[in-house]
Every structure is written in structure tokens, then in C-alpha cells.
């Protein structure tokens, strides 16, 4: 029979070996559907991390109503990167590459920076863990696809505005 002190010691060792995990989510607009998605992403990450016995939730970083094409205006993203470089957590999980960055160079740059500090990124829907050997190649390919999707979306949004402008004689 294990006495109280031995059990407490075992529990402390378990806590010490848990990985601190941060999650990152982002939605690009403030509309109601996106807001619901934003809330559901946060709830999903919280539950996902809680279900993994080796993980401990550090924090959910979330940018709302901000495009993923540029990291400068994404306060929570930048705060997450700073916390990672500070050694506050070990791993970031995010839904997919396009939520993390819609620019190939940013994706590669930030995942390399994080890796230098021992922090991996798991892109769940893309099945990429940046601590895996072939991750950077797959990340580059998938990031390029996300960047192209962003460009096409931007064109679709701008096209009706441009057509209306031309038709109005301006």
C-alpha cells in the first residue's frame, strides 16, 4: 500500500512531466458566423488539451477580426510568440496553417524561431508537427496553398467592388 507521501510524490512527478500547451485561434472577420466559429474553436482546444493526460493548458491565444496575411497587427499572435521565446510553454496547437499564417515566409520564419526555443507547433487539420523531420517541407507546401487561397479570396472580394465602381462611371 502506497502511503500519502509517496502518492503525493508520484503526483508531483506527473505534473512536472506534463507539457505546457498553448492554443492559437484566429477568425478574420467580426460577423456572427465567424464569432460562433471563434468561440467553438476556443472550446474545442480547451477540451482537446484537457483530454490529453500529458498536456496542461497554458493559455488560448486568440485574434478576432484580423487577417492572417500579416502578423504585425495580430497582438495575441505576437504575445504568444514572445511567451514561447520566454520558455513559458512547450507546444502550440492550432487548427490549420491558414489560422497561424497565410504567408509562406511567415509560416516558415515563425516555426523556425519557435523550434530554436524548443517549441513545436501542431497544425491539426494539416497533420503537421513542426518537431517531425519532414515537417518543414510539408509546411512550405501547405503554406503556399494557404497563401494562394488567401490571394484568390481577396480577388473575389475586390472584384464586385471594382465592377460596381466601373459600372457607376468612376
Task: For the regions a language model picked out, list residue spans one by one.
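Short, intrinsically disordered, charge-balanced linker/junction segments flanking boundaries
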Residues: 169-170
Amino acid at each position: 500500500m502506497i502511503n500519502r507521501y509517496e502518492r503525493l510524490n508520484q503526483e508531483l512527478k506527473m505534473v512536472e512531466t506534463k507539457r505546457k500547451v498553448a492554443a492559437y485561434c484566429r477568425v478574420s472577420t467580426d460577423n456572427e458566423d465567424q464569432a460562433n466559429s471563434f468561440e467553438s474553436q476556443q472550446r474545442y482546444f480547451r477540451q482537446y488539451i484537457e483530454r490529453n493526460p500529458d498536456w496542461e493548458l497554458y493559455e488560448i491565444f486568440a485574434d478576432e477580426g484580423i487577417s492572417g496575411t500579416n502578423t504585425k497587427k495580430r497582438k495575441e499572435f505576437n504575445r504568444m510568440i514572445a511567451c514561447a521565446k520566454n520558455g513559458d510553454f512547450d507546444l502550440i496547437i492550432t487548427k490549420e496553417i491558414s489560422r497561424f499564417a497565410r504567408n509562406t515566409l511567415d509560416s516558415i520564419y515563425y516555426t523556425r524561431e519557435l523550434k530554436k526555443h524548443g517549441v513545436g507547433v501542431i497544425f491539426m487539420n494539416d497533420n503537421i508537427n513542426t518537431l517531425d523531420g519532414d515537417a518543414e517541407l510539408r509546411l512550405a507546401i501547405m503554406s503556399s496553398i494557404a497563401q494562394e487561397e488567401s490571394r484568390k479570396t481577396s480577388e473575389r472580394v475586390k472584384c464586385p467592388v471594382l465592377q460596381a465602381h466601373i459600372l457607376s462611371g468612376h
